[in-house]
């Protein structure tokens, strides 16, 4: 039955055609690729980039209590504030804030250019095919790799406890002080629909730009197995969500969790 569902999935009959540009389901425990669509196509990955930004940031300094100054809006909140690195990391991984990614890059020794060099060096270390990073946020359409590259990025990020903790929070709540005023900050997760429905997601990151389409990367642990799901180039949020749910329910999650 599972094999039949997988065949339907790859052929595109489970949802409206056409399939996104690239779809992958990988069982890291067995080493088997269960679903692959356009696996070798080099594509922009949008804000999935921010997982690389998080890893390079943590490789440099895991202290999340140190404060940073942002000239932009972190999480679309307040300009020119002073933030802890933890708050900035939450804004980037949960709310997918681009200024948060730029703030972390600016804090790196040698600044933004050195940070980008470190991102590309990390991509080589992870053996991400045809990977290139032109900015820390994913807005740059030159941030590209293949499904295999995103898979390796996700698996590497799942080895960072801080990324596992932050990326799957349904929302973040904290107080932020600016000019003697305290403002309550609420950051809902950009992948909140799946996080509310499934409790076995251990890393997640969404992405969206016009060149990349609607993107999603997840690491899922179920029944002693570790899976990677990648969706690149969905036409809209609903299609991305529908494909992810079909993969989860038909191939990973126990049916009694529906």
Q: Each PLM stretch: what is its role?
A:
Residues 15-148, 152-161:
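Active-site-adjacent loops and short helices of periplasmic peptidoglycan-processing enzymes
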Residues 1-2, 85:
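Structural motif marking the loop-to-transmembrane transition
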Residues 3-12:
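Sec-dependent N-terminal signal peptides
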Residues 17-22, 110-258:
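Penicillin-recognizing serine hydrolase domain
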């Amino acid at each position: 039955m599972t094999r039949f569902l997988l065949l339907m999935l790859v052929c595109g009959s489970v949802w409206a055609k056409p399939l996104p540009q690239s779809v992958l389901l990988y069982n890291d425990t067995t080493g088997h690729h269960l679903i692959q669509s356009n696996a070798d196509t080099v594509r922009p990955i949008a804000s999935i980039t921010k997982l690389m930004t998080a890893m390079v940031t943590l490789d440099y300094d895991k202290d999340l209590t140190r404060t940073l100054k942002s000239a932009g809006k972190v999480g679309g909140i307040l300009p020119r504030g002073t933030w802890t690195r933890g708050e900035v990391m939450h804004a980037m991984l949960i709310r997918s804030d681009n200024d948060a990614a730029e703030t972390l890059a600016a804090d790196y020794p040698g600044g933004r250019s050195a940070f980008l060099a470190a991102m590309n060096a990390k991509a080589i270390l992870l053996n991400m095919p045809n990977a290139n990073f032109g900015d820390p946020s994913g807005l740059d359409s030159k941030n590209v790799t293949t499904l295999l590259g995103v898979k390796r990025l996700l698996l590497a990020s799942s080895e960072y406890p801080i990324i596992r903790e932050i990326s799957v929070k349904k929302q973040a709540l904290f107080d932020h002080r600016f000019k003697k005023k305290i403002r309550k900050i609420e950051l809902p997760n950009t992948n909140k629909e799946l996080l509310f429905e499934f409790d076995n997601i251990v890393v997640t990151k969404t992405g969206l730009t016009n060149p990349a389409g609607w993107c999603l990367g997840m690491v899922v642990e179920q029944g002693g197995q570790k899976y990677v799901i990648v969706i690149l180039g969905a036409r809209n949020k609903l299609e991305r969500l529908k494909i992810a749910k079909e993969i989860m329910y038909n191939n990973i999650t126990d049916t009694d969790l529906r």
